[in-house]
Amino acid sequence: MASSTDVRPKITMACEVCKHRNYITKKNRRNDPDRMELKKFCRNCGKHQSHRETR
């Protein structure tokens, strides 16, 4: 089981427009300590939207 201080935790990316959680990815906490934000395709909206890391 993964510990809470894992260097590469799994994170969920949610669309900022419709709030759907579309993507699951990993990130390195040492290189990116703050929340990740990427432009990805949202299937619910049907276009590229900004996706932000959720907790």
Swiss-Prot record:
GO molecular function: structural constituent of ribosome
Domain of life per record: Bacteria
Family matches, as InterPro entries: Ribosomal_bL33, Ribosomal_bL33_CS, Ribosomal_bL33_sf, Ribosomal_zn-bd
Classification via Gene3D superfamilies: Ribosomal protein L33
Biological process (GO), any one: translation
Keyword Chaperone: no
Alphabetized UniProt keyword annotations: Ribonucleoprotein, Ribosomal protein
Cellular component terms per the entry's GO annotation: cytoplasm; ribonucleoprotein complex; ribosome
Pfam families documented for this protein: Ribosomal_L33
PROSITE patterns named in the record: RIBOSOMAL_L33
Family designation: Belongs to the bacterial ribosomal protein bL33 family.
HAMAP family in UniProt: Ribosomal_bL33
This protein's name: Large ribosomal subunit protein bL33
Protein's organism: Mycobacterium leprae (strain TN)
Record gene name: rpmG
